[in-house]
């Protein structure tokens, strides 16, 4: 079963929760990057957070180029999870802790996401580990949330290691178990990360990289 219905429902609930609780849309620091998600005027030089709404892409994003580059068929949910919307990362509460689901802020962010997924999959090949691809972060970036490319199950994974704890048998099941977390936007500091800099996915991965390398 595709994860898209669960993702649709979570994003709808996410924004409704902010409106019901705070009377406003969730806000996000775009760091000068425009997006169709932004509600209201966008000022590139502004350092303020913006209100945003998820926007369905007219042309869904595809990972066919990644599959061709790696000669690897990706679990179909990757197209639904990352290719259907432009959105900011979304926060959640769960029985496993608090976390963040990664999303794509704009087309440049999607291109950068593909590069980082290729890098992650190449690392798995080098380590002779089964392929996975990431969907988010858990516990303030200490752990990655990944999908097992063989069967679509969702796991906790530390970079460089095998997935350690299975959380759900499918991405749809995992998303359905999450609750929106209401929190003010956080302006993340610039941290070194060996990847192209974009505000959505890589702001989150910079935090994860900083947390992980700082504890090794």
From Swiss-Prot:
Subcellular location: Cell inner membrane
Domain of life of the native organism: Bacteria
Keyword Nucleotide-binding: no
Membrane topology: Peripheral membrane protein
Gene3D superfamilies, per database record: Syd protein (3.40.1580.20)
Keywords from the UniProt entry: Cell inner membrane, Cell membrane, Membrane
GO cellular component, one term: cytoplasmic side of plasma membrane
Keyword ATP-binding: no
Function: Interacts with the SecY protein in vivo. May bind preferentially to an uncomplexed state of SecY, thus functioning either as a chelating agent for excess SecY in the cell or as a regulatory factor that negatively controls the translocase function.
Family: Belongs to the Syd family.
HAMAP family: Syd
Name of this chain's protein: Protein Syd
Native organism: Shewanella oneidensis (strain ATCC 700550 / JCM 31522 / CIP 106686 / LMG 19005 / NCIMB 14063 / MR-1)
